[in-house]
Amino acid sequence: MNKIDAIELEQMKKNIPPFKPGDTLKVHVKIVEGDKSRIQAFQGVCISRQNGGIRESFTVRKISNNIGVERVFPLHSPTVDAIEVITRGHVRRAKLYYLRKLRGKAARIREKKYVAAQ
């Protein structure tokens, strides 16, 4: 392991829950306004994850007032306070960009069904 990899490894966050495209996420973001800071939640469907390592980012899409809003978050950014997985989605694609063209019920994603272990 070279020096750059070692530095990147120590700066990466450790408490990130496993999630995939299709999952509904609630991302808590730190917002600084002047000398005050607050945490704002952004809830939507993860439509993609890009790259890997410390440069990894993910895109979350939600519908707000009948307008689609997408935000790209760096995964290991200090402005991302927490990530919660609300529901797991069952999709067969890695990038869900086709959701941009769909409206209403057509844009729904099936929920993944779990079988309880016995």
UniProtKB/Swiss-Prot annotation:
Task: Give the organism the record lists.
Answer: Geobacter sulfurreducens (strain ATCC 51573 / DSM 12127 / PCA)
Which keywords does UniProt give here?
A: Ribonucleoprotein, Ribosomal protein
Any one annotated GO CC term: cytosolic large ribosomal subunit
Tell me the GO BP annotations in alphabetical order. translation
- Could you tell me which Gene3D superfamilies the record lists for this protein? 2.30.30.790
Could you confirm whether the keyword Calcium appears in this record? no
Highest rank taxon of the organism:
Bacteria
Q: What does this protein do?
A: This protein is located at the 30S-50S ribosomal subunit interface and may play a role in the structure and function of the aminoacyl-tRNA binding site.
Q: Belongs to which family?
A: Belongs to the bacterial ribosomal protein bL19 family.
State the InterPro entries in the record. Answer: Ribosomal_bL19, Ribosomal_bL19_CS, Ribosomal_bL19_sf, Translation_prot_SH3-like_sf
Q: What is this protein called?
A: Large ribosomal subunit protein bL19
UniProt key word DNA repair:
no
Recall the GO molecular function terms of this protein's record. Answer: structural constituent of ribosome
